[in-house]
Each structure stands twice: as C-alpha cells, then as structure tokens.
Amino acid sequence: MSGYDDLIGTIPEIVNEAIMAEMRFYGYYPDGHGGYQGMAGLGGAPPPIAGPNMPDDGMVIPDMLNGGSISVRGIYHKWAERIPTMFNLYLGMPDPADFQAEADQIRVALEQLSSQGKTSEDDHDNIDFEGNSTLALAKTVSERLAGWQGAASASFQEYLNLFTTVVGNQALAAEAIRACMYMERELWNNSRNDVASFAANARAAFSHCGDISVDDIKQVISVVSTVNTVLGWFPAFKTVTAPVGKGLSVANVFVNTFGGQKEATNPLASRGVEDTWNNIVKADKDLRDKIRTTERDIDTSLSNIYDRVSAAPDIRSDGSTDQSLYHLPRPTGILNADEKGDVVQVTVDPALITDTADKLRSDLAPEMRTAAKSLNAGDTSGIWNRRAEIGIGSTGAYLSYLNVTDELHNEIKQTADELDWAADVLDAVADNYVKGDQAVAAALAEVHQKIVESAAPSGTGGHPTGGQLTPF
C-alpha cells in the first residue's frame, strides 16, 4: 500500500484503473502499446483504439447500457476529471510533526509556570516537564511585605498570595492548549493514513471491477452435491478425490486444492464501474465528514479555553476573588502609592527593600516573560493550511488557537509587567530614605506614567480595545 506521501503519484494510477475498468466493461483490453483492443468475434477483431495518452482517433464504441454509441475519449475525460477533482483535495494536508513542534513550544511555557512540573511513565510525546522552583520566591516576598504595615504593601501582599494560584491556572490553560496540539497531530496522522488507504482501496476496486472471484466460482459449483462430483470434472484431480470424504465442504476443498483464498474485503469494491464510483464518492464524504467533525471539536475546545482565560474574575459572596481566575487583579494600592508611608510604615533597611525589588524584577518577572514568549513565538499559520474542503476551513482551528495563545500570552506578560512596576515602586521607596518625600513622589509618578503608556489592562477582566490607554 502506498503511503500518503505517494498520493500525488497514486492519483493518476487510479485514473488509469478506472479507465481500464470501464473499457473492460465494453470488451476492450490494453493492447500493450498504450491503446486498447476489442475481443475478436465472428466478424474478426475490431480496430484498435488509441489510449488516453495518444492522439484522439475519434473512436466510438457501442453503448451496451443505453444503446447507440459512446465516445472513447469521453470515457477518458470523465475519469481524468472525476478522480483528480476528488483526490487532489487531500494533497497538502497539515504535517503532524508541525503540531508536535507547537506542543513542544508550549512545553517551554509549562516549565516556567509550573512549580512542580509533571512526570509520567511514558514520555514518548515529550509530555514531561521540570518544575520551576523560582516561583516560590513569591511567597518569600509576600512574607517580607507582611511586616511593613503600609496599605500599599498589604495590597501587594494579597496580590502575591494569589500569584501561585493564578500562575498555576495559567499552567493548566497552557497544558489544555498543548493537549489540543496533540489532538491536531493525531488528527492529521490518522487522516493521512486514512487517505492513503482510501486511495489504495479505490485503485484496487477499479482494478478488480468485473473480475471473477473465488466466491463467484464457489457460487457456481455450490449446486453440486458432493466434492467428488465437482473434482471429478477435472481428470487431473481424480487422484485427489479418491481419499476425500463426502463430508468435506466444497469451500474447503476449493481453498485447499486450488489454493484460492478469499481476498480481504475492500469496502469500495463492486462489480460495476459506476457502483464502484458511487462507493468511492460515499467514502470520500464520510472521510471528510470525520476530519471536519474532529477538527470542529478541537476548535471548540480551544474556544472554551479562551473563554475561561479571558473571563473577568468572579467575586465570591464573601468579597474575595474567585480562585479560578487566570489573571491577577492589579494591586492598585502599591502602584498608586504617593509616598513611602503607603508602602513602608516601619523602619526597614533600604537594602532589604532593594533586595525585594530585585526578586520581583530579576527572578519572578523573567520567568513570566519566558513563558509568555514561548506562547508568542511567531507566525505559525502556515502549518494549518490545507484545501478549504478539508477540516473546518483553509486554516482549520488556527484562529481559535491564535486567540487563546495570544490571550494567555497577554495575561502572563501582564503579570511580568506588574512585577516590574512593583519593583520600580520599591526602588523609589528605598531611594526615599536618602532623598525625601518629594523625590519619592516624583519617582512614583514616573512609574504611574510608565503604566499608562504601556496601555496595560486594568485587571478587571479583558484587555482594552481600539488602542485605548488604561489610565491610573
């Protein structure tokens, strides 16, 4: 059986088998020179007929079904149009390996977002990934802020307490997206195999149109009462019939003596050429329906993940934020601080404040940015391309994939940005121990302006649209 990569060469072979099948129906067989020769009758052999790759000789043959005559060239053209029109749709289907590469790219994000990682007994799909111990620094920073007593530090402490939960949810979202890439990989792996089998069966079905099979012969001889009588018709088998008991079935003797074996059932096979074609048409529809249904399910899964990631966090009855959120509510207390007392109301070593800022800026934020970057590694739309009739359109589930990875990328990047901005606030507070309140107010104003210019979301769910800035 030819594989999917051989499909472009298999298509003309199917055309040729279909033409030969119909020509056999009219009593014409290949002459060994590219043309066809009819069976000789009482009036002698009919004139030879030019083959499909030879100049048109204008020959017509009797139409045994409808009467009159039929153009031989019309037979050639019919199959030369029907077969490629159907099978060319399957050329250029997505490569399963490309979706493994996408899954591996998402794996990078998982290694950054997961504190524990994932292990399994079977890692043939590279499904395992290491945990990220750096995320534990969020707890260290939160504990440090707890002793500073400022309103802003309390706000940011609450933010960091949610950090591990939210980043864990982001990891779950990334894992769900990665699972969809495995589904796409298997869809195209299976579909390519199905197409290869479909093409091979179509070629074989036309090749055997009108053949006399083992079952046909069995049917003819089934009316004979005994094995001995059947084989007795053939002198060469008289020595075989002597020891054969009458209880042995005709079928068994036929198989054992003649060596005839029933061929594997070809779901497309039929005695007539048009019946075979009708079977192929139905199989084509069924195959494309299966691909379409499967990819639609993947597309729906990606859309559902997007809806969860992009939804505004719910507020519980006790006023706390729903733990299922995928992005962090902005710690407006610390980012709107006007003086150092908003952050620190106790005596703190400035070096400790600076160290806390460094943990946010140099440790936690880069981890988030690495994760975000892996979800925005460039335009991968090309790997989804195929004929629009295959799957759910010419780019399949790409738009849903793009939407959800872009949304998750933005949420993770937002987390990194806010860690940086909080670090800037802490640096300004540390400087205040030397420069005074007026200096810290100016430094904090610069942080506020940086946030506004970034057009970052407000943390209330969703992103600004139409280029609108989010003021503070």
Model-derived regions, located:
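N-terminal secretion-targeting helices of virulence/extracellular proteins
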Residues: 1-179, 183-204, 258-472
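Hydrophobic alpha-helical transmembrane segments and adjacent short intramembrane/lumenal linkers
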Residues: 199, 206-213
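Membrane-active amphipathic alpha-helices enriched in small hydrophobic residues
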Residues: 210-262
